[in-house]
Amino acid sequence: MKTESTNIIGKADGPTSYFVLSRDQKLTLKQRIQKTRFQLKKKWIEKHIAAEGHTMDEVCKYVQERYGFREVSGKSAGIQYEYEEMRTSFMITHAPELLGEYAKHPELKGHSEEEIREFMAQVEDRKEVARNVPKDKFDIDFHKYEKKMGDTQMHIIIEKKYDYIGGGASGKKTIKEFDKVFKDVYRYYGVTKEDIVNRTKRYDMMVRTLARR
């Protein structure tokens, strides 16, 4: 089985996953150490960050010219599925008013199996309503870039309208290489002086991305 890594970064909230955790769950010693290292690295990055931002169009050009990624045809079934899933997720985040009675995010009332099943069913119903909203009411500017290396691959997804960058890779060695590439791409995307002054989401996501292992 191939090892796979996925990174999801962006100025705006992207594809949404739901995790139900126990309230009394505690961090392990290893997790506490990792958290401390992350916080220290985050502070160092914040101290040295510079205003060198680029546009999404420039980022698209950068991943192709610097790393040899190629854009995947938007006509393929796989790309159409990914596009629809992202459009649904972004609509729920940025235009919930289009969902009518499903505009409000469902609430998890408790942690019993029945309550969790009910919550997940409501989440799926909401997504289905979003899928049926016409594209002329809400749409995204989705692009996927891929680089294949034998039986492994890495890919970067860029959504220009909401300034989203994400991606992933398969294969242990490829994952390590991808992490370096992804951080460099996000570093190139960068931040503006306004982002630094106002501590925008773009600023926060860049710091968090670069602070990861």
Where is each model-derived feature located?
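Conserved mixed alpha/beta catalytic, RNA-binding, or beta-rich assembly cores of soluble enzyme
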Residues: 34-213
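Amphipathic alpha-helical packing elements
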Residues: 2-29, 35
